[in-house]
A protein has these predicted regions:
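Well-ordered beta-strand positions
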Residues: 19-21
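Generic short beta-strand segments
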Residues: 46-50
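Short N-terminal binding/cap micro-motifs at the start of the first secondary-structure element
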Residues: 12-17
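Short, well-ordered, aromatic-rich surface patches in folded extracellular/luminal domains
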Residues: 1-10, 23-26, 32-35, 51-109
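Long, charged/polar, surface-exposed segments that mediate recognition or autoinhibition
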Residues: 37-45
């Protein structure tokens, strides 16, 4: 089971450190804490899995990059890193954490 996730985003517009404490259902964005609804934790996990699959193996030369560390209950750390990429839904991801009544729309192609 996931206990904690750390997300570090670096690009010219965002230098964010996000932590998500699954046990206490608290997310922190640059030292500002937010309570996270349990259902949103599933969305967060789904989004991070998408980022890992879509961006996590890229190794470009751009200044945009992200690193995500996932800590499980056995204290195992899984890390993935994307460089030269930037998750397209990152701003919405932050909005979902910050605004507890935000309703995201799932895009189906």
């Amino acid at each position: 089971m996931i206990e904690l996730i750390e997300i570090n985003i670096n690009n010219p517009f965002n230098n964010d450190l996000i932590t998500i404490d699954y046990l206490n259902k608290i997310a922190t964005i640059n030292n500002q804490s937010y309570n996270v609804k349990p259902g949103y934790l599933n969305y967060i996990t789904h989004t991070l899995t998408y980022w890992q699959n879509e961006y996590g193996t890229k190794n470009g030369i751009d200044i945009e990059e992200f690193t995500i560390k996932v800590y499980d209950d056995n204290k195992k750390i899984t890390t993935f890193h994307g460089k030269g990429v930037y998750p397209s839904n990152y701003q919405e991801f932050k909005t979902i954490i910050k605004e507890p009544n935000y309703e995201w729309k799932r895009k189906i192609n």
